[in-house]
Amino acid sequence: MSNFIDKTFTVIADILLKVLPASKQEKQAFSYYRAGMSAQSEGKYAEALENYYEALQLEEDPYDRSYTLYNIGLIYGNNGNYSQALEYYHQALELNSNLPQALNNIAVIYHSQGLNALQMQNQDKNLEIRNDEYLELAKEFFDKAAEYWRQALKLAPDNYPGAQNWLKVTGRQISEEYF
């Protein structure tokens, strides 16, 4: 099914490139973006990154750049490079603050880091860092996750039910406005 969707997207994109008025540079940027999306959907992350970086060199529209930056963040996040992923998600949000999916992904990374800190507390009894320091570190990560999930839910109140539940269960929800 995803192959059908990818082919359909390619056909529609080709038609749009021919029909819509756009400069040669804009069309070329979109072609690189589309090639990046195709490679990413096939799991060819290095190829996808090359295409996205080419698209960034050509793309001038901040809104379109934000989605390219977001997709780069996705690739880094999927490959476990969370600091790079965070960097690209934040760059995307600077250009387009209406990206709840980027806010959600940032929250997921911070939540994961909080869980890792708790796991370190349980596993590494011999390290110099004290248990309460692990707990404080975990709390900081969880608070950051809550901050970004609240922002995502303000933009997309019907999305992220797991985040909504986590905010309620942990007492980190601020208001009922998005529930």
Curated annotation (Swiss-Prot):
<comment type="similarity">
    <text>Belongs to the Ycf3 family.</text>
</comment>
<dbReference type="InterPro" id="IPR051685">
    <property type="entry name" value="Ycf3/AcsC/BcsC/TPR_MFPF"/>
</dbReference>
<keyword id="KW-0150">Chloroplast</keyword>
<keyword id="KW-0472">Membrane</keyword>
<dbReference type="GO" id="GO:0009535">
    <property type="term" value="C:chloroplast thylakoid membrane"/>
</dbReference>
<comment type="function">
    <text>Essential for the assembly of the photosystem I (PSI) complex. May act as a chaperone-like factor to guide the assembly of the PSI subunits.</text>
</comment>
<keyword id="KW-0793">Thylakoid</keyword>
<feature type="repeat" description="TPR 2">
    <location>
        <begin position="66"/>
        <end position="99"/>
    </location>
</feature>
<dbReference type="InterPro" id="IPR011990">
    <property type="entry name" value="TPR-like_helical_dom_sf"/>
</dbReference>
<dbReference type="Pfam" id="PF13181">
    <property type="entry name" value="TPR_8"/>
</dbReference>
<protein>
    <recommendedName>
        <fullName>Photosystem I assembly protein Ycf3</fullName>
    </recommendedName>
</protein>
<feature type="repeat" description="TPR 1">
    <location>
        <begin position="29"/>
        <end position="62"/>
    </location>
</feature>
<keyword id="KW-0677">Repeat</keyword>
<dbReference type="InterPro" id="IPR019734">
    <property type="entry name" value="TPR_rpt"/>
</dbReference>
<keyword id="KW-0802">TPR repeat</keyword>
<dbReference type="InterPro" id="IPR022818">
    <property type="entry name" value="PSI_Ycf3_assembly"/>
</dbReference>
<dbReference type="GO" id="GO:0015979">
    <property type="term" value="P:photosynthesis"/>
</dbReference>
<dbReference type="Pfam" id="PF00515">
    <property type="entry name" value="TPR_1"/>
</dbReference>
<keyword id="KW-0934">Plastid</keyword>
<keyword id="KW-0602">Photosynthesis</keyword>
<feature type="repeat" description="TPR 3">
    <location>
        <begin position="126"/>
        <end position="159"/>
    </location>
</feature>
